[in-house]
């Protein structure tokens, strides 16, 4: 996993103090190559946005509160302990995010393929209907 930060120098300097691991040369080169692949970037962005639109629609239909996201994941309120929700989704063949204290009834779900998002929505509707 490779990440990067765009920040003011003083903030980047402060954050750099907490870096716990170095990234190897192969990972860095792979990240640079990926960042320069505009066609794949645009394809991925399109698919993530399509997935989020499908999830937003399901959340709206079920009246579930959620936070609109500029990332590849969505944070939404389940209204039940996350451990309970995780078990319910797992029983439907879907694995979802870990707890994010103190938001014990919220779930973070990452985008997958459109087919995976559809499976997620089907399980979600079964659990909340």
Name every feature range the model reports, one short phrase each.
Residues 87-96, 100-129:
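PLP-dependent enzyme catalytic core of the Aspartate aminotransferase-like
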Residues 1-59, 64-67:
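PLP-dependent aminotransferase class I/II
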Residues 49, 53, 58-92, 111:
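Conserved PLP-binding catalytic core of the aspartate aminotransferase-like
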Residues 12, 41-42, 82, 86, ...:
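Internal amphipathic alpha-helical segments of the cytochrome P450 catalytic fold
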Residues 1, 70-72, 103-105:
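A generic structural signal for well-ordered coil/turn residues at beta-strand boundaries
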Residues 3-6, 85, 115-116:
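Short, hinge-like loop/turn segments at secondary-structure boundaries
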């Amino acid at each position: 996993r490779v990440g990067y930060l765009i920040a003011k120098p003083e903030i980047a300097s402060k954050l750099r103090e907490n870096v716990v691991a170095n990234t190897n040369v192969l990972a860095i080169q792979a990240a640079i190559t990926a960042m320069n692949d505009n066609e794949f970037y645009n394809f991925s962005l399109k698919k993530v946005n399509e997935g989020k639109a499908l999830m937003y629609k399901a959340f709206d239909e079920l009246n579930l509160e959620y936070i609109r996201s500029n990332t590849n994941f969505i944070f939404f309120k389940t209204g039940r302990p996350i451990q309970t929700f995780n078990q319910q989704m797992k029983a439907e063949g879907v694995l979802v995010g870990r707890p994010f204290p103190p938001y014990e009834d919220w779930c973070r779900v990452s985008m997958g393929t459109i087919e995976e998002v559809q499976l997620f929505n089907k399980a979600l509707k079964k659990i909340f209907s």
